[in-house]
């Protein structure tokens, strides 16, 4: 509070539902509070209700990263609809853009004419690596030029998840066509190496940034129809979505893109256009600048 006073701070921005200090500052200094919500908290319900109660009572404006998050927050009896505003996260196109990835393919020992189906995500309980393997295996089995590529590590203490995943890969009938690496910092290179980007999250991801990054790199997207991806992907325009947690249906959407080079290119161009129009860093900054003028 002392710091806020001394530095002439006139507005508080609480980032994520885990940050509660803004309430104290708002009450002590009588400043407006913007609460920025990135998560969809369903369980435990008591925690969800408590956070919604605090937001409803103290936030002058609740900003959510997607309509999926906004709709979840609005379901609470503690929150008024006009308290909630959606501001999509932006992607920096100076970092994420189309590049020639032939050298990246060489680096990973992938043929230039291979069809690369990729996913990027932490190895945890719900990012869906198991569903990804289940969905891509039949495609790999009928197409010897297809390669499945997974990138991502586990949290410290959960390395067993990686061991399980590695075992699932080695046990796969298409093991020789599946490659997995740990966390890789130059994700732009990976997205550009992919022909199809897949988001197989088994729980609704509020706003999966990896999808926006892949779109910025000109990729068609396949995924499950829940969470924020439904706002990023316009079905039939820059991607295809399947019923959540149905790997066989997800497989069909990937297959549809795998079979049609023209559709992949068309969807990829549409991805770039859509990302720049709706999910750019510029629009993100402008939307917050306008909001800060309250």
Region locations from a protein language model:
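Short alpha-helical donor nucleotide-sugar binding micro-motif in glycosyltransferases
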Residues: 4, 183-184, 190-194
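Acidic anion/phosphate-binding donor-loop and adjacent secondary structure
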Residues: 71-78, 82-83, 90-107, 113, ...
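Glycosyltransferase donor-sugar binding loop
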Residues: 91, 120, 147-163
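A short, well-ordered alpha-helix in the C-terminal region of glycosyltransferases
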Residues: 103-106, 249, 256, 263-278, ...
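A conserved mid-protein helix/loop that constitutes part of the nucleotide-sugar donor-binding site
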Residues: 115, 119, 124-138, 240, ...
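Nucleotide-activated donor-binding/catalytic signature segment of Leloir-type glycosyltransferases, i.e.
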Residues: 162-182
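Short hydrophobic beta-strand element within catalytic cores of glycosyltransferases
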Residues: 220-223, 233
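Conserved acidic donor-binding segment of nucleotide-sugar-dependent glycosyltransferases
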Residues: 235-236, 240-247, 256-262
């Amino acid at each position: 509070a002392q710091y806020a006073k001394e530095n002439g701070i006139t507005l508080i921005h609480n980032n994520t539902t885990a940050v509660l200090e803004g309430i104290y500052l708002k009450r002590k200094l009588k400043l407006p509070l913007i609460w920025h919500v990135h998560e969809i908290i369903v369980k435990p319900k008591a925690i969800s209700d408590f956070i919604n109660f605090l937001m409803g009572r103290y936030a002058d404006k609740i900003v959510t990263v997607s309509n999926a998050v906004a709709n979840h927050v609005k379901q609470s009896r503690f929150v008024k609809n006009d308290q909630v505003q959606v501001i999509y996260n932006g992607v920096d196109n100076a970092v994420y853009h189309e590049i020639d990835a032939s050298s990246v393919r060489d680096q990973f020992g992938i043929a230039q004419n291979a069809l690369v189906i990729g996913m990027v995500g932490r190895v945890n309980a719900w990012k869906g690596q198991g569903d990804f393997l289940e969905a891509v295996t039949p495609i790999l089995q009928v197409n010897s030029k297809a390669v499945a590529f997974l990138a991502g590590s586990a949290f410290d203490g959960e390395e067993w998840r990686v061991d399980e995943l590695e075992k699932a890969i080695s046990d796969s009938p298409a093991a020789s066509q599946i490659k997995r690496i740990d966390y890789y910092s130059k994700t732009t290179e990976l997205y550009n190496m992919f022909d199809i980007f897949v988001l197989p999250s088994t729980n609704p991801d509020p706003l999966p940034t990896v999808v926006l990054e892949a779109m910025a790199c000109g990729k068609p997207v396949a995924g499950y129809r829940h969470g924020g991806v439904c706002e990023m992907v316009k079905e039939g325009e820059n991607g295809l979505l399947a019923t959540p947690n149905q790997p066989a249906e997800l497989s069909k959407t990937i297959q549809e893109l795998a079979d049609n080079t023209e559709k992949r290119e068309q969807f990829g161009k549409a991805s770039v256009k859509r990302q720049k129009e709706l999910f750019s860093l510029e629009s993100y900054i402008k939307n917050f600048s306008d909001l800060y003028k309250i």
